Curated annotation (Swiss-Prot):
Upper classification of the organism: Viruses, Duplodnaviria, Heunggongvirae, Uroviricota, Caudoviricetes
Gene: cII
Protein name: Transcriptional activator II
Entry's Gene Ontology BP terms: regulation of DNA-templated transcription; viral latency
Cleavable signal peptide: none
Subunit structure: Homotetramer. Interacts with cIII; this interaction is essential to stabilize cII that would otherwise be quickly degraded by host protease FtsH.
InterPro entries associated with the record: Lambda_DNA-bd_dom_sf (IPR010982), Transcrpt_activ_CII (IPR007933)
Organism: Escherichia phage lambda
Keywords: Activator, DNA-binding, Early protein, Transcription, Transcription regulation, Viral latency, Viral latency initiation and maintenance
Molecular function via GO: DNA binding
Pfam families cross-referenced by the UniProt entry: Phage_CII
Function: Acts as a transcriptional activator that allows virus to initiate a latent state. Following infection, participates, together with cIII, in activation of the Pe and Pi promoters, which are responsible for the transcription of the cI (repressor) and int (integrase) genes, respectively. Both of these gene products are required for the establishment of latency.
Length: 97
């Protein structure tokens, strides 16, 4: 059971890391790290799953604030929330029929 929980946590961490790389872009990530972009592609396949498991075993979670913010924005769009008017109540137009 503990192993399954760690595996699930590792998958969550791996997903967060891959999403961050995707949001930033492979080229920008490679430039920031100081490697070629092909190296980042190899890391995605070979190192990130292993590193994610290591982080899960060490109980070092990855907080993904950008993804949480994006999820809130998508939820607001899907629920079609209207923003409050930027005017005073007396300035709003009233129509009576």
């Amino acid at each position: 059971m503990v192993r399954a929980n760690k595996r699930n946590e590792a998958l969550r961490i791996e997903s967060a890391l891959l999403n961050k790389i995707a949001m930033l872009g492979t080229e920008k990530t490679a430039e920031a790290v100081g490697v070629d972009k092909s190296q980042i592609s190899r890391w995605k396949r070979d190192w990130i799953p292993k590193f994610s498991m290591l982080l899960a075993v060490l109980e070092w979670g990855v907080v993904d604030d950008d993804m949480a913010r994006l999820a809130r924005q998508v939820a607001a769009i899907l629920t079609n929330k209207k923003r409050p008017a930027a005017t005073e109540r007396s300035e709003q137009i009233q129509m009576e029929f």
